[in-house]
Amino acid sequence: CSMWDAIYDCLFFCINQDIYDSLTPEQQQVVDEAGQKAVEYERYINRSGDEEIMSRWEKSNGVTFTKKEDMDIDSFKKAVDGIDDWFVNELKSAGYDDAQDLVDLFTEDSVDTVEDYSDLNWPETTWNFACSTTETSTWADGGRKFGELMEKATGGKVKVNIYAADQLTNGNQSEGIQALMNGDPVQISMHSNLIYSAFDPRFNVVSLPFIYDSYDDADAKFDGEAGDKLKEILNGYGLHCMGIAENGFRELTNSKHEVKSVDDMKNLKVRVAGSNLLMECYKRWGADATNMNWSETYTALQQNTVEGEENPLPAIDAASVQEVQPYCSMWDAIYDCLFFCINQDVYDALTPEQQAVVDECGQKAVEYERYINRSSDDEIKARWADKNGVTFTEKADMDIDSFKEAVDGVDEWFVQELKDQGYDDGQDLVDLFTK
């Protein structure tokens, strides 16, 4: 038996879509949670049996095992060099035009691979990952990717449990961040800058309106000097930021009518994230803005307590909000990021070499989350339009200037708000994101 680890296959654990759709969103969340736990259990028992099987085969059947390190693996790799290109052409010939994107997801070093660092004397430990959104969200997927990479890098010594919807703090997002700062019961989390603003209003700078031209522009800022400044602030709260992931452009949905100009926003009851900056922006746009936990929003929209909300499409989709929101304005007005952090004490307990591995896995998970978050928009829009009858108003069909004019000067308002609260670096922060 040659233990070469050349080819892998997975198991899709699926439920019929019609059966799933017949459940309430709350019931769907329970099904997803139970399903993910069953998947994690199956992975564990599948992987943990190899050593026992090998020992039994040797004793009972006289099987000779050839380990990977004793094989000329490069000779096998060279023999199949270029098979990725063959596969892409095969798919294209069959009419599948997304083949290269699929291959890139599984083969790019930035997404799915990490070296074996199991010789670094890792402690056997389990870290709890928390995020505000559901099990099926890109946030949770980012946490799962980090867990997969860490388990692979450490030879299974470090494992990561996923707790979506801030389960460990009863759905309270701010308490989820506080639990991370305490290091118990959360050691790792992915939370929005808007939620962090409850602890430090400077994090609102990320979400000043209309300051990003594109996703590339956002990446350049978060991977550059602006992102470094945010990481420095996080460090002051006992957190080490492994990378800055993405919630994305917060599109506006509502149940009343199309929103094309600022006049359409007048008195619209909109749930916004817990941020003074967002509240100020929506006030200037004429909306009746209110704050509530994301976990409470679907019911509030269903009962018409609020008429609209604003979030990136993947986050809206993961919570099935499109079921009660027939209008969506794709205005790209406000963007928010996700801080992918580990408790500083947990991080400091590692050796410098181990810390480097954690940072590598963290950055790969961030890049993965960004990719899947962005690549899903077109599919989501097509499905919402077909299945839920959602009407989309594109940015090109909106009077964007009317929205910009309404929030003209909000940068200066924000800097003054920070000064009033004792933060003198507000203008420098704004300049990092707007110059």
Model-predicted regions and their roles:
Residues 1-217, 229-435:
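N-terminal secretory/targeting leader peptides
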Residues 222-228:
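Signature of the catalytic double-stranded beta-helix
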